[in-house]
Structure formats: structure tokens, C-alpha cells
């Protein structure tokens, strides 16, 4: 059986052919750690608004060829289809298994790179995704120039946006889609960086607005402090 995490034969990296995957565990019971600040109905509205915003931002970003939502939740998939995303029903397993399904989809459609975008980033905007892709292209061009002068070649690129604690991964770009295995979970930032190093990938880490995710009441306060709280979460 083919290993879905195994890199394929190296090819020129084209960051104008990016597939985006948005993993969603579910809408009904999401973000229970926000229970001290939001009731179940408010949490549901928050998660739904963030998912819609994430899809809209990705669909409108130049260079992103297609956007898919992978989820075991029929409600999340219906929302995704309504918002214009491809839907990938997840049969089982956790986040990394769902992303492996997304990787297989990206390969089937011939994408040169895969962008993983969690659906809990209040600062998600097309402008932010464009900034990430532009920084990736600039870093890739500089690395290609450096390695070319040294007589070697760039075969893989990994770009990561860490969370505010610099422990988790808030956004991950991998080129080609199989450049590294997914290691989302506790300590994922270090795990992804180590995987990039072992695989000989060019690695770039970018902090910024997308380093804020919504997991705790303190995160909600941080979002509100920079004008991203309340109803704004559901707006484009």
C-alpha cells in the first residue's frame, strides 16, 4: 500500500498551484474550552462564522487553486459546500488522518503545494494568506539562488505560522504536498520543524496576526482587544 505521507518525486515548486485544506472536527461540540465565556449556541455561531470566513478568505486568495474542507461532521460539510469549498467526508481517525485524506486529494488534483488552514483564526483574511504566500515565494527564490550557486537544488519547502505560545501550528504550507508527515497535536511546531529538517526542506517560520487562535477565554479577550471579537468573527 502506498504511504500517503511519503514524498513523491521532486519537481519544481510552483506556489501558484496551491491546494488549501481546512480541517473541521465538528460544529456542534466544538470549542468546549470556551464554555466559561460562551454558551453552546454562541460557540456554535462562532465556529460557523469562522469556518465561513476561512473558506471565503482562501477562495479569494490568488495562487490558491482549490479549497477543501475535511470533516466527519455532515453539518460542517454542508456549510462548506454552500460556501464554495470541496467537501471531503472523514470516515474516522483524528486530525492528522483527516489531513492525510486532504493530502491525497491535493495530489489527485495535481497541486504543487498544500496549505493547511485551521478554522479558528479570527484574523484570517485574504490579505494575510496573500502575505504568507508572498513571503514563501520570496524565501523560496532566495533559497533556490543560494543552493543553485552551491550546485544543489531545493526539493521541498515548509512554511509554518506558530501559535502565540510558539508550541502549536496555526498554519502550515508544504511543497510538495508530501514534503513532511503531519504532526498536529501537542508540540506540533517543534515536530513539524524537525520533520522539515530531517527531510531536507527549506523551512520558514512566520509569526503575525494568524498566530492568534481561539481556544480559551483569554484568546477571545485578545481577539476583542485588536477588534476581532464579537460579530466580526462571522464577517468576511
Region locations from a protein language model:
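Acidic donor-binding segment of Leloir-type glycosyltransferases
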Residues: 64-86
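Short phosphate-binding loop-to-helix
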Residues: 79-113, 188
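Short beta-strand-to-loop acidic/aromatic patch adjacent to the donor-nucleotide binding site
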Residues: 112-120
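Conserved donor-nucleotide/metal-binding helix-loop-beta segment in metal-dependent transferases, i.e.
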Residues: 124-164
Amino acid at each position: 500500500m502506498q504511504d500517503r505521507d511519503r514524498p513523491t518525486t521532486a519537481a519544481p515548486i510552483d506556489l501558484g498551484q496551491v491546494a488549501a485544506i481546512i480541517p473541521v472536527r465538528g460544529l456542534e461540540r466544538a470549542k468546549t474550552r470556551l464554555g466559561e465565556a460562551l454558551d453552546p449556541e454562541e460557540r456554535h455561531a462562532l465556529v460557523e462564522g469562522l469556518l465561513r470566513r476561512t473558506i471565503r478568505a482562501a477562495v479569494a486568495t490568488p495562487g490558491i487553486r482549490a479549497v477543501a474542507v475535511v470533516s466527519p461532521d455532515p453539518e460542517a460539510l454542508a456549510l462548506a459546500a454552500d460556501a464554495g469549498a470541496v467537501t471531503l467526508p472523514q470516515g474516522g481517525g483524528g486530525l492528522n488522518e483527516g489531513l492525510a485524506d486532504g493530502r491525497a486529494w491535493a495530489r489527485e488534483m495535481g497541486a504543487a503545494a498544500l496549505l493547511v488552514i485551521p478554522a479558528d483564526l479570527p484574523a484570517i483574511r485574504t490579505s494575510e494568506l496573500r502575505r504568507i504566500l508572498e513571503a514563501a515565494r520570496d524565501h523560496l527564490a532566495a533559497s533556490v539562488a543560494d543552493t543553485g550557486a552551491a550546485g544543489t537544488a531545493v526539493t521541498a519547502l515548509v512554511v509554518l505560522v506558530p501559535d502565540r505560545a510558539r508550541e502549536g501550528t496555526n498554519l502550515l504550507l508544504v511543497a510538495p504536498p508530501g514534503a513532511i508527515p503531519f504532526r498536529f497535536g501537542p508540540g506540533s511546531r517543534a515536530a513539524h520543524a524537525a520533520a522539515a529538517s530531517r527531510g531536507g526542506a527549506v523551512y520558514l517560520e512566520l509569526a503575525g496576526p494568524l498566530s492568534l487562535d481561539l481556544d480559551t477565554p483569554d484568546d477571545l479577550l485578545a481577539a476583542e482587544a485588536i477588534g476581532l471579537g464579537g460579530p466580526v468573527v462571522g464577517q468576511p
